[in-house]
Amino acid sequence: MSSDTRPALILGSSSPYRRELLSRLRIPFEVATPDIDETPLAGERPAATALRLSRLKAEAIAALHAGALVIGSDQVCTLDDQQIGKPGTHAKALAQLQLMRGRTVTFHSALCLLDGRTGEAQIADIQTHATFRNLSDAELDAYLRLETPYDCAGSAKVEGLGIMLLERVESDDPTALIGLPLIALTGMLRHAGYPCFGA
């Protein structure tokens, strides 16, 4: 497959950070925002939530774009195997960070590449273990007022000031923590026959 015949590639996400990450690959892509219910199911394990939502996002966009390769992604933050969602408010964000300080949190960055030509879906859950610094309440409050990460799982906006919350990060994919694991994605694209280098 040459670069002239490759299928449309669509990122099913409203996240500017995922868009920026995908643009690093220098391949043409479009962006579409999926409209799905992101509520976890009763009794659903965190990794299962992330994988299910990444696939639902890809399927929602693929239904509107026949023959395209669609990327769906979702991230779930967990501590002691309990999901830590998007806080929504300053008070909830502060409570999350107080709970996580000095502890190691797992981020499940789920990825789905749905091939609209064949219906094949490749899925992966890339885990990142992030150890938080033991910061004071005043430092946590200052971070929240500067960054306002109320739409980020676990209140940790690591693509910005949130990186200062962390003491250590362990992952097989350095971009997974920001929300789009590029090592896994490029492997999926190659499996789908997509010419990542344009040849």
Curated annotation (Swiss-Prot):
Its cofactor is a divalent metal cation. Its main location: cytoplasm. It is an enzyme of class 3 (hydrolase). Coiled coil: none annotated. GO terms for molecular function: nucleoside triphosphate diphosphatase activity. Pfam families: Maf. Keywords: Cytoplasm, Hydrolase, Nucleotide metabolism. It is found in: Cytoplasm. The record marks Y17, Q75, E159 as: Important for substrate specificity. The keyword Phosphoprotein does not apply. It catalyses: N(7)-methyl-GTP + H2O = N(7)-methyl-GMP + diphosphate + H(+). GO terms for cellular component: cytoplasm. CDD domains: Maf. Its EC number is 3.6.1.-. InterPro entries: ITPase-like_fam, Maf-like. The active site is at D74. One of its GO terms (biological process) is nucleotide metabolic process. Transmembrane segments: none annotated. Nucleoside triphosphate pyrophosphatase that hydrolyzes 7-methyl-GTP (m(7)GTP). May have a dual role in cell division arrest and in preventing the incorporation of modified nucleotides into cellular nucleic acids. Belongs to the Maf family. YceF subfamily. This is 7-methyl-GTP pyrophosphatase. It comes from Cupriavidus metallidurans (strain ATCC 43123 / DSM 2839 / NBRC 102507 / CH34). The lineage of its organism: Bacteria, Pseudomonadati, Pseudomonadota, Betaproteobacteria, Burkholderiales.
